[in-house]
From Swiss-Prot:
Species name: African swine fever virus (strain Badajoz 1971 Vero-adapted)
Description of what induces expression: Expressed in the early phase of the viral replicative cycle.
Entry keyword set: Early protein
Functional note: Plays a role in virus cell tropism, and may be required for efficient virus replication in macrophages.
Name of protein: Protein MGF 100-3L
Amino acid sequence: MGNRLIRSYLPNTVMSIEDKQNKYNETIEDSKICNKVYIKQSGKIDKQELTRIKKLGFFYSQKSDHEIERMLFSMPNGTFLLTDDATNENIFIVQKDLENGSLNIAKLEFKGKALYINGKDYYSLENYLKTFEDFYKYPLIYNKNK
């Protein structure tokens, strides 16, 4: 790869205000590709919403409705990376905000070093997640599956 830079990815550099604004605008667009699921303050999820979760190809789709509710409600508010239980190949990003009663789920796919989120190409997982974290004002929390 040599000294070539891929697009504008510069690790360990401080972004300008203009770049941050551009990233913020991109993130607003990116958030639209997430599958939003509404949850009640009690942690209960409507049957229609549970059906939608199962149709996402979500890795918990084989679990019972109660297990899905318990798993999602037990997480604190924040942004998570979750791996597929069975294969550890699929990675999902989950953003939970109980105050607003919402849950965003998007599937991440890696092809070589490129990152695809719900089929859309991103040049850097690190940049995407940092932007996501800044936008939602939540720290990233990585799950421990093993």
